[in-house]
Amino acid sequence: MKQNRIASLVEQDKKLLVAYYMPEYPVAGATLPVLEALQENGADIIELGIPFSDPVGDGPVIQEAAQRAIRNGVTVKNLLETVHNARRGAGCKAITVPIILMGYCNPLIAYGGDCFLNDAVEAGVDGLLLPDLPPEEAEDFLERAKSFGLTVVFLISPVTPPDRIEMIDSLSTDFSYCLAVNATTGTAKLAGEDADAAIEEYLKRVRQHTRKKFVVGFGIRDKARVMQMWKLADGAVVGTALLQRLAAAHTPGETARLAGEFWQALR
């Protein structure tokens, strides 16, 4: 089996900058140009959201982006078609960075378990992050995903006890995803000495109880915070701030330009 792009990337000694983008946000036709802009400006991994009508773990910005994506016609099926087009350079320069789909279980169940996994791999998806999939209940899914060569990423939070951190680390295929705060995505601001000290203590604790790499997300908005996370973790994820920057765009071209400018500033 061909080595997964994520596995190849995490073997490198580099800090990762991971983008989260909701397809077809804010306008239809934006996805492929945005993927190209993010790749060209240094995104190491791109997470694509799978829009869902009841995203309980997401903040208002991502909830609105998901609703906009649904109105703009995004489905699991055509999202996989978009990834396929991105990989072969149909509508944009060929996207070669790893792509992770992040979303809730219901749309994937509706699509059909193994059928989804097979189609995801065929399209060029590298990994999955499902926030509502408890690690304790994931054994069957994890084995099926691994059999298709897909990376599975699980979440760690500031209140995750050490033994559970170790379990999540063992189950995550290549790396884990640490929530920087106990909040819905994008709603928390990382600021102030107390917050910084708490985050540092938390991530040091994660480091002590993990063998694999981990990235940090939720609430990271600028280069200063990216650099802060790079000192403590193996990568930073930026999503809500990117979507906020794109919100006022009216065309796919304008969306891509704003995405590129925003991402370049993070580097």
Curated annotation (Swiss-Prot):
Instruction: Cite the Gene3D superfamilies for this sequence.
Output: Aldolase class I (3.20.20.70)
Q: Which GO terms describe its molecular function?
A: tryptophan synthase activity
Q: Which InterPro entries match?
A: Aldolase_TIM (IPR013785), RibuloseP-bd_barrel (IPR011060), Trp_synthase_alpha_AS (IPR018204), Trp_synthase_suA (IPR002028)
Enzyme Commission code(s) on record: 4.2.1.20
This protein's UniProt keywords:
Amino-acid biosynthesis, Aromatic amino acid biosynthesis, Lyase, Tryptophan biosynthesis
Q: Name one GO cellular component term.
A: cytosol
Any one Pfam family match given in the protein's UniProt record, by short name: Trp_syntA
Q: Which catalytic reaction applies to this protein? A: (1S,2R)-1-C-(indol-3-yl)glycerol 3-phosphate + L-serine = D-glyceraldehyde 3-phosphate + L-tryptophan + H2O
Catalytic residues at 47, 58
Name its pathway: Amino-acid biosynthesis; L-tryptophan biosynthesis; L-tryptophan from chorismate: step 5/5
The family database entries (NCBIfam families) matched by this protein are listed as: trpA
Subunit-structure text: Tetramer of two alpha and two beta chains.
According to its UniProt record, which protein family does this protein belong to? Answer: Belongs to the TrpA family.
Free-text function comment from the UniProt entry:
The alpha subunit is responsible for the aldol cleavage of indoleglycerol phosphate to indole and glyceraldehyde 3-phosphate.
- The name on file for this protein is Tryptophan synthase alpha chain
Q: Which organism is it from?
A: Chlorobium limicola (strain DSM 245 / NBRC 103803 / 6330)
- What taxonomic ancestry is recorded? Bacteria, Pseudomonadati, Chlorobiota, Chlorobiia, Chlorobiales
